[in-house]
Amino acid sequence: MNEQIRSILAQETTKTSKIRQLYLLGVPRAEIARMVTNGNYGFVVNALRQMREREDGLSIHPVTTMLDYTFNRKFGIEIEAYNCSRERLARELREAGIEVMVEGYNHTTCPYWKLVTDSSISGNDTFELVSPILVGEAGLQELEKVCWVLDLCDVKVNESCGLHVHIDAAGFSMETWRNLALSYKHLEPVIDRFMPASRRDNYYCRGLGHVSDGMIRSARTVDELKGRIGDRYHKVNLEAYSRHKTVEFRQHSGTTNFTKMRNWVLFLHKLVTFATRGQVPAATALQDIPFLDSEQKLYYKLRTKKLSV
């Protein structure tokens, strides 16, 4: 929490932007006034009132209790790639201590990694590597070992490949679902800029821009919200909930790079955690995302610069 506050205060942005971010973190107004406006409480009150008016009275909730972003959440990974036979990759994974099976295409959740076929991937020796349920930092450590093996086997990706992340959604309230959909929609322009062009307007990971904020806000059930967003080929896939009790994020490009995977998994974890308390406002800039620390903001700032060339 203190690190996030320091990061916000150090930003080269407006006082109003800092006030909004601190408010969303749950910092009391009097404290915000002390830190940002030299004690001008009225300025803070007016800035927050204008923020609410800009959002048309929407429920941009302050985080009234400190959110715990410790990563102990269940998650899953699907890695689409090519250039290694499934049999060889399975053998190398087993030698590295990773339990894996070679199977036909299926949606069954298994207690082991599975190598399946996927007709949407182009290239030689294509495959999809699907994880079992992973948990927190221990799960990331196992994923890193898998990435070492992918590197050993010279596994490659191209524009037909994606990295899909499932986040456990079993305990989501309907308010969390709405906040999550709205937050991703509002952040979509920012996320698009740190994703390759092939993942910005892709049939297999379509955006949420076709759904109005009002349609999301008025959804009363997960099925109703799913119906308004559409089929599973969207950046946020709610169909995964009925099958796996997860929400699937499909936008990330195919990769075998553990640093990219880790940062994206943690981004999604923090996004989901934040959605339990509120939603990210529309037109939020990368440096203003309330749930990212300074290190992740820098990482995605550099990714954005690299992909803008």
Regions found by a protein language model. Give the residues of each.
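Basic, amphipathic alpha-helix used for nucleic-acid engagement in HTH/winged-helix/SANT-Myb modules
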Residues: 1-13
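Short, amphipathic alpha-helical "recognition" segments used to contact nucleic acids or chromatin
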Residues: 10-27
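Helix-turn-helix DNA-binding helix
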Residues: 19, 41-45
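Short, charged amphipathic recognition helices of the HTH superfamily
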Residues: 25-35, 162-164
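C-terminal accessory/tail domains of diverse enzymes
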Residues: 31, 42, 49-156, 170-309
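A general structural motif at alpha-helix termini
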Residues: 36-37, 48
